[in-house]
Amino acid sequence: MNALLSSFLDAMVEEYRREHCATVSQVMEKMIAFSDGNIHDIDHLIRVWTYAKTIGDLEGLDADTQYVLEVAAITHDIACPLCRRKYGNTNGKHQEEEGARMVRAFLSDCGMSTGQVNRVAYLVGHHHTFRGIDGIDYQILIEADYIANASENGYSRENVMNFMNKIMKTESGKNLVKAVFVL
């Protein structure tokens, strides 16, 4: 597809999204309210969203992929409150299982296409799974969540270097890790 046609299609998708879908800020507002004052969860989702948005922008994602990525970054830990109550922890597998279902209901009134909701649900349902990464949105979500978790939890330099060298694929994500952790 030539660059002019691609640019035109991106503009059409963006115009449709602005008219019919919740904005990223509206999803953020809804997710913050859903978090019910849990400052740790709110700070984490904002941090992951910021890294995901930055990496996506720097990697030059098309408008639809960027939108799906940002919504997934905001909602990726939607199941944490339920997992704390139901299982007594926020184990990644429980988050993935519960989150994929929960995010569909959460986004049901946001005007997103079925394809967008399905992709967000897939990303939320796999955000702790580092194998079988099937798209740039998935890769960036994994990278953004890792950077946030590593900074919040004080991961060792060795752990960060290992993740960067074995899991990270985007140059922008690698550059952020190097800057954040002074590598």
Task: Locate predicted features.
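Short secondary-structure capping/junction motifs at helix and strand boundaries
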Residues: 111-118
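His-Asp-centered metal-binding catalytic motifs of divalent-metal-dependent phosphohydrolases/nucleases
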Residues: 66-88, 99, 121-128, 145
